[in-house]
Amino acid sequence: MKDLPIIALDFESKEKVNQFLDLFDESLFVKVGMELFYQEGPQLINEIKERGHDVFLDLKLHDIPNTVGKAMEGLAKLNVDLVNVHAAGGVKMMSEAIKGLRKHNQHTKIIAVTQLTSTTEDMLRHEQNIQTSIEEAVLNYAKLANAAGLDGVVCSPLESRMLTEKLGTSFLKVTPGIRPKGASQDDQHRITTPEEARQLGSTHIVVGRPITQSDNPVESYHKIKESWLV
């Protein structure tokens, strides 16, 4: 799995994806989320892979264990590089996800979403009714993911150092909420720069709008890549 910034392809159509990818003459690591996958389906994944790019399929599966396991059997056939579930589904659900994935696929990494980077302390307490800090909530979900045998989690860069200390350096910390200096925060709350994410222990970063909505996506990508890989 490439150690590159993961570009979130937050587009609504295959045509816009191809227009964006045509700008680059190099292999990328891209994220396909719900918006795009539900519009275009598995065929788009195959086409992106055929172009030589790594793919993070970000569907955040969360259902009863049997359903998630069966769904993961289907996703396994797409041979993406990274998939995820939601840790709130519990250890049994995450374990079934791994079983389903490994029936057809031995190389895809699987991680769990902990708390979205748009989540605030107020939302955690009053909407989710979780009466702890965000850091404690993330750590609890990360421990469950680790116990289930997952490869890592999705978290904010602000929790990466804590998770490295508690769960080790090999436990993946895939972190959205990345904004270059001076970029708009948008709907993210727990954010850092690429350099800060690296220093805090993130193993991978996910960046969307600062690249995809840039006037010069290639230049913006390379600036972020350079600051991440420094």
Swiss-Prot record:
Keyword Nucleotide-binding: no
Family (UniProt): Belongs to the OMP decarboxylase family. Type 1 subfamily.
GO cellular component: cytosol
Class in the EC hierarchy, top level: lyase
Protein keywords: Decarboxylase, Lyase, Pyrimidine biosynthesis
Biological function: Catalyzes the decarboxylation of orotidine 5'-monophosphate (OMP) to uridine 5'-monophosphate (UMP).
Enzyme Commission code(s) on record: 4.1.1.23
Sample GO molecular function, one term: orotidine-5'-phosphate decarboxylase activity
Residue numbers annotated as active site: K60 (proton donor)
Matching HAMAP family: OMPdecase_type1_B (MF_01200_B)
InterPro entries on file: Aldolase_TIM, OMPdecase, OMPdecase_AS, OMPdecase_bac, OMPdeCOase_dom, RibuloseP-bd_barrel
Pathway membership, UniProt: Pyrimidine metabolism; UMP biosynthesis via de novo pathway; UMP from orotate: step 2/2
Organism from which the protein derives: Staphylococcus aureus (strain Mu3 / ATCC 700698)
Gene for this chain: pyrF
Protein name: Orotidine 5'-phosphate decarboxylase
GO BP term, example: 'de novo' pyrimidine nucleobase biosynthetic process
Catalytic activity, reaction form: orotidine 5'-phosphate + H(+) = UMP + CO2
Pfam family, one: OMPdecase
